[in-house]
Amino acid sequence: MFQKVEGIVIRTTDYGETNKIVTIYSREFGKVSAMARGAKKPKSRLAAISQLMTHGHFLIQMGSGLGTLQQGEIISSMKEIREDIFLTAYASFIIELTDKATEDKKHNPYLFEMLYQTLHYMCEGVDPEVLSLIYQTKMLPVLGMRPYFDTCAICHQETDFVAFSVREGGFLCSRHAEQDPYRIPVGEAVHKLLRLFFHFDLHRLGNVSVKDSTKKQMRTVLNTYYDEYCGIYLKTRRFLEQLDKFQI
């Protein structure tokens, strides 16, 4: 059965000398994989459409197992991302997280829209690190995780937040922070932004400016929480950490 889907290429795997297995996150079916025969040949009609991060329409012969990519039409090649090493690094982190966090053929139009919108914001010049933090925060419920972002994880009151506790699963107020010796001290902006990122509609994102120190604290909170509860290892995260050392 042939299906036309709108999707974004989130992974490619070489198969033999000339073929690729292309993994697409689609609006209609979620994550699907298909064999792109001859796609590694420079003159192949599938060469461009099967590139990582390409947003397009794909005609796939679907089956119970691996499908076959017949043809495609590019909507956006994400050129702006491809031409910038830092954008490529953050976009690669986002698509790898999407790949590792999802199962095959699990329909989730919300997640497709979030992936699409995030990558297009990157192309438009929005801070890629902030976008990756937003995406990482919004992926938490997709993975079945809901940290205490609105109230203290211990007293459940909306009060002054001074730390994040991985053990308790959320922010801690000044009265209860001492209960976790391994708490992560955070500024007020970290709580406000993570809470905002968790709840707000990504389509309503305007001009956003976040201090480097705040971004660093947010990254520490999210990465530590993911490490404890998620169990997903991302190669791109390590590359981002290495790349950050060279960024002025």
UniProtKB/Swiss-Prot annotation:
Residue ranges of coiled coil: none
Keyword Iron-sulfur: no
Signal sequence range: none
UniProtKB keywords: DNA damage, DNA recombination, DNA repair
Keyword ATP-binding: no
GO process annotations (BP): DNA recombination; double-strand break repair
SUPFAM superfamilies listed in its UniProt record: ArfGap/RecO-like zinc finger, Nucleic acid-binding proteins
Entry-linked Pfam families: RecO_C, RecO_N
GO cellular component term, pick one: bacterial nucleoid
HAMAP family associated with the record: RecO
Record's function text: Involved in DNA repair and RecF pathway recombination.
Homology family: Belongs to the RecO family.
NCBIfam families: reco (TIGR00613)
The protein's name in its UniProt record: DNA repair protein RecO
Gene: recO
